[in-house]
Amino acid sequence: MKKLNIIFAGTPDISAQVLKDLYKSQYNIQAVLTQPDRAKGRGKKVQFSPVKEVALANHTPVFQPLSFKKNPEVLEQIKQLKPDVIVVIAYGIIVPQEFLDIPRYGCLNIHVSLLPKWRGAAPIQRAIQAGDTKTGVCIMQMDAGLDTGDILNTLEIEIQETDTSQTLHDKFAKLSIKPLLETLEKIEIIKPEPQQGEPTYAHKITKQEGLIDFTKSAWQISCHIRAFTPWPGAYFILDDEAIKVGEFEILYQNTDNRKAGTIIDIYRSGFDIATSDKIIRFRQLQFPNKKMLNIVDILNGKDLDKYIGYKLG
């Protein structure tokens, strides 16, 4: 088989890591597609996407259409390159059927769930939030639907009880190259398989979703916190202030019939709150406009004992 010509489309860190790994392979990366540069921070300094940084470091042409409708010339430029494959991971821009039809072997999407479970924008967070014990990487032949294409390859990954969205994201960034390379090696003979099972949807995360519902079980709250770490962050409301939570542990003791959301006790080692079944101890909290701190450090400058017995929500 001749050396494949590949165009890569992606934007954030996870895409950048896969691109780095792809450069180490025998394949020829003709061009890279990524979202337009953004002005960020107080100084509104223009920043390149992580994928663009990697592409420029490897002297690869970069295309950054606002959309393919607004920049149809990019489609023509891609057609002229005659790629064998286009690899897509977290690109963030809708691609038309005309784009999907360009490469000889089609467009391959790297999706970080075991499809058809968790189609959509936030598969990592939704898998943790739901308490799933496994997830994985799917190499999918893209079609016009939302993550509905046939499956070419999968890699299953366990979700540990300590995994957050960040740690699981990092695992995907490291491991996604393996099933991709396996797929590319067999691209001429691999047989696509239709997705099997009932689909579920990983809807986009909103900032407001971080609010903790203490009427749920301690395990459900653990899943909630880990799903929304680092963004948007899980929090509770105390004195009309949103208090973000950091490190925590579940205390395997009952709540002595105290109502869910009751602040049971405050120690130098933690801030104990009743859930529907157990006690959850927060070892770190972040008050508005402050850093995330250990409880012992917060107690050095703040009187929290007055909240013992207070019911949240």
UniProtKB/Swiss-Prot annotation:
Enzyme Commission code: 2.1.2.9
Keyword Cell membrane (UniProt): no
InterPro entries named among the record's database cross-references: Fmt, Formyl_trans_C, Formyl_transf_N, Formyl_transf_N_sf, Formyl_transferase-like_C_sf, GART_AS, Met-tRNA-FMT_C, Met-tRNA-FMT_N
Domain of life, source organism: Bacteria
Reactions listed under catalytic activity: L-methionyl-tRNA(fMet) + (6R)-10-formyltetrahydrofolate = N-formyl-L-methionyl-tRNA(fMet) + (6S)-5,6,7,8-tetrahydrofolate + H(+)
Keywords on record: Protein biosynthesis, Transferase
Entry binding sites for (6S)-5,6,7,8-tetrahydrofolate: S113, L114, L115, P116
A GO-annotated cellular component: cytosol
Gene Ontology MF, one: methionyl-tRNA formyltransferase activity
Similarity comment text for this entry: Belongs to the Fmt family.
Annotated function: Attaches a formyl group to the free amino group of methionyl-tRNA(fMet). The formyl group appears to play a dual role in the initiator identity of N-formylmethionyl-tRNA by promoting its recognition by IF2 and preventing the misappropriation of this tRNA by the elongation apparatus.
This protein's name: Methionyl-tRNA formyltransferase
